[in-house]
């Protein structure tokens, strides 16, 4: 919590000089056990070779075994630093065109890559040349370790597989106030954000696309980006990118890349993330919002089908690194493309902010993607990374170093997940009885594709399951099935003590086998932290606690009729009652032993409503630090628009210095910096601040430990 931070305290009394904290950090590198020298071998020579190898091999590589993905960094700088003057790196000048030189560097790196691959009998996954020169290999760990003796090799590190980190926010954080500034609102205009994720559904209305399912279906058949004149996307919003993975890629098999980075229908993570950062917004009529953002009051925002992203005028690149499921080893390749998205050797189209809502738990400090993040920071690009969501501790993220890499990269702006004052909830519409007709809050089952269902499929009469099988965990008898046929079944979700007798899929399958059209579940929570899966063949809705009693009574009476629909998903905005609480699953980062702590700040990430892939105009709610990071990416774009000569150091400092809203748990206890960073983000204050304080010895980390 920020009130204990030396640098924040100084901000409050108006210091205008950079604070030199003189922090010294040291990292211990484990050494191999001593071995007996070979007969006749010069021991001094052998000692020198061991020392060289230990400098080149990362700590994790020293112990690695078997066939693994590895990044081999070659000596020297990447093409960007080799060809661009210092003023460009400091964001004081536009990049110079050095295409011929960049192409020569690329050719040299590709030649080196083939050489090391042949020497180690490994397969080339990809090469990098813009950020730093190197190659990703898949091969035997020992054979790749032997490359450490090559004079052109600087560092060898295992690649750690990365996973996806699964409208009120713009009001809570002051982002909407920045849209309404006099003369010029700060909406991210002129700033390019690269989203490294599962792709973007650029046909969605939130990004200016046609907003139809037919347009999405047409776009998914292409292996190249459609022409700008095709009408399938808005070139003012979406600038293109690459699919580095292919639908079937899962991190273990071979990627099948192409030039069309559209999201997968069974994915949607990247689409949601992109909308949170820079979606135009979708109005109540399902049209792309093309109006004046400065006129959007909280009331008008609440009426929109999808609220704008935090930087609605920013432009987007998509670098797809995930298939439709599974992990990825391709993040380093995507980071290399951030500096030259179209690959022509001209860096004038580079992104200034890169969002990564991905990572891995407890990954080592020597992850090569973290090196790339640090290098990009030096080259003028800020990486905004989700802190991560705990998966191995019953959803509780209060475990040191849980967040892993690249969230623990020193220069990254690492974002924890806080609760906003309001959140979006799905709605169902009660059609009968008339005395309780209207919308009720809850959440839709996840595995069913509502966008392709007919209106008739998503409505019907609801009857209660028999008391003897009220949880639906057992198969329904023939007698019960006769009562459920062609109706929806109301099932109790949990026991009175909150325990759950079986999972949702079992219940949905039992209901389907009995001939039911859909499932309605009760709930003992107003907003559940975790969703319900259901199954792929019948729809389902879990009713919030506040509406469960009346739904139960009318279902038992046989008078309840209900409707679901894409137009109702995310259709309610309710008060959370938990403003500025930290979400319990938000992962804790490093504790300071390495000379710094993580995360850096927090942003709203609970029940965030954003664009849903393949729906045209629909929305979906996700919770996690994956949703917090893109909101912060949009704020970074606002700050850079307001201060166009800011370097990543200054952007990060402005955002951390101004994030002075304390976060607390459900009991009101305030969190310390090693769980939430400096505090909850404040977009308006980040733009307004003129006093930037950061660690003079290590400015990339901003704060002291």
Which residue ranges define each predicted feature?
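Secretory targeting and sorting signals
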Residues: 1-33
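Subtilisin-like serine protease catalytic core
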Residues: 33-34, 65, 83, 149, ...
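Secreted peptidase-domain scaffold signal
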Residues: 93, 343, 388, 444, ...
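Hydrolase catalytic cores
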Residues: 274-277, 321-322, 496-498, 504-534, ...
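Autoinhibitory propeptides
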Residues: 2, 21, 33-37, 111-192, ...
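Inhibitory N-terminal propeptides of secreted protease zymogens
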Residues: 35-165
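Structured lumen-facing ectodomains of secretory-pathway proteins
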Residues: 205-214, 220-226, 235, 241-242, ...
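Short acidic, glycine-rich surface-loop motifs adjacent to enzyme active sites
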Residues: 338-365, 386-387, 486-496
């Amino acid at each position: 919590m920020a009130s204990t931070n030396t640098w924040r305290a100084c901000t409050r009394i108006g210091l205008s000089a950079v604070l030199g904290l003189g922090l010294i950090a040291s990292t211990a590198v484990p050494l191999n056990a001593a071995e007996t020298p070979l007969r006749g071998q010069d021991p001094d020579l052998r000692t020198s070779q061991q020392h060289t190898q230990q400098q080149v091999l990362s700590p994790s590589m020293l112990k690695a075994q078997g066939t693994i993905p590895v990044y081999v960094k070659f000596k020297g700088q990447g093409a960007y630093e080799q060809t661009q003057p210092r003023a460009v790196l400091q964001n004081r000048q536009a990049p110079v065109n050095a295409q011929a030189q960049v192409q020569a560097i690329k050719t040299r790196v590709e030649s080196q890559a083939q050489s090391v691959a042949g020497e180690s009998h490994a397969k080339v996954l990809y090469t990098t040349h813009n950020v730093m020169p190197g190659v990703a290999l898949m091969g035997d760990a020992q054979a790749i370790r032997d490359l450490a003796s090559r004079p052109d090799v600087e560092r060898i590190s295992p690649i750690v597989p990365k996973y996806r980190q699964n409208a009120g926010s713009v009001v809570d954080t002051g982002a909407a106030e920045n849209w309404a500034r006099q003369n010029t609102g700060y909406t991210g205009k002129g700033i390019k954000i690269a989203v490294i994720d599962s792709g973007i559904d650029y046909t969605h209305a939130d990004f200016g696309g046609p907003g139809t399912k037919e347009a999405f279906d047409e776009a998914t058949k292409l292996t190249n980006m459609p022409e700008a004149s095709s009408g399938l996307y808005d070139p003012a919003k979406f600038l293109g990118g690459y699919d580095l993975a292919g639908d079937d890629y899962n991190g273990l098999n071979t990627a099948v890349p192409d030039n069309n980075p559209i999201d997968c229908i069974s994915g949607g993570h990247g689409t949601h993330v992109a909308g949170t950062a820079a979606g135009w917004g979708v109005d109540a009529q399902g049209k792309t919002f093309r109006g004046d953002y400065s006129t959007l009051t909280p009331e008008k925002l609440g009426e929109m089908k999808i609220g704008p992203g935090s930087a609605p005028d920013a432009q987007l690149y998509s670098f797809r690194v995930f298939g439709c499921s599974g992990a990825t080893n391709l993040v380093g390749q995507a980071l290399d493309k951030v500096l030259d998205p179209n690959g022509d050797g001209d860096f004038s189209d580079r992104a200034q902010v890169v969002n990564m809502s991905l990572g891995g738990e407890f990954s080592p400090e020597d992850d090569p993607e973290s090196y790339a993040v640090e290098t990009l920071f030096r080259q003028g690009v800020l990486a905004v990374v989700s802190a991560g969501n705990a998966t191995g501790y019953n959803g509780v993220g209060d475990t040191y170093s849980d967040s892993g890499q690249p969230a623990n990269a020193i220069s990254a702006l690492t974002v924890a997940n806080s609760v906003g004052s309001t959140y979006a909830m799905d709605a169902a519409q009660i059609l009968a009885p008339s005395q309780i007709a209207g919308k009720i809050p809850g959440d839709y089952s996840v595995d069913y594709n509502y966008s392709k269902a007919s209106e008739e499929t998503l409505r019907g009469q609801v009857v209660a399951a028999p008391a003897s099988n009220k949880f639906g965990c057992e198969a329904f008898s023939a007698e019960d099935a006769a009562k459920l046929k062609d109706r929806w079944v109301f099932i109790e979700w949990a026991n009175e003590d909150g325990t759950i007798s079986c999972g949702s899929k079992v219940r949905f399958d039992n209901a389907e086998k009995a001939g039911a059209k859909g499932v309605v579940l009760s709930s003992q929570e107003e907003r559940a932290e975790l969703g319900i899966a259901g199954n792929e063949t019948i729809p389902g809705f879990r009713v919030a606690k506040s509406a469960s009693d009346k739904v139960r009574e009318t279902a038992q009476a046989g008078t309840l009729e209900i409707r679901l629909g894409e137009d109702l998903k995310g259709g309610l905005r309710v008060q959370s009652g938990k403003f500025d609480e930290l979400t319990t699953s938000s992962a804790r980062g490093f504790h300071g032993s390495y000379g710094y702590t993580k995360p850096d700040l927090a942003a709203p990430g609970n029940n965030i409503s954003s664009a849903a892939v393949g729906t045209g105009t629909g929305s979906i709610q996700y919770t996690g630090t994956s949703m917090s990071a893109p909101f912060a990416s949009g704020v970074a774009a606002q700050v850079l628009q307001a201060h166009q000569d800011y370097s990543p150091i200054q952007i990060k400092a402005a955002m951390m210095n101004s994030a002075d809203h304390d976060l607390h748990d459900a009991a009101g206890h305030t969190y310390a910096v090693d769980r939430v960073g400096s505090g909850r983000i404040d977009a308006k204050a980040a733009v307004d601040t003129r006093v930037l304080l950061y660690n003079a010895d290590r400015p990339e980390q901003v704060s002291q430990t």
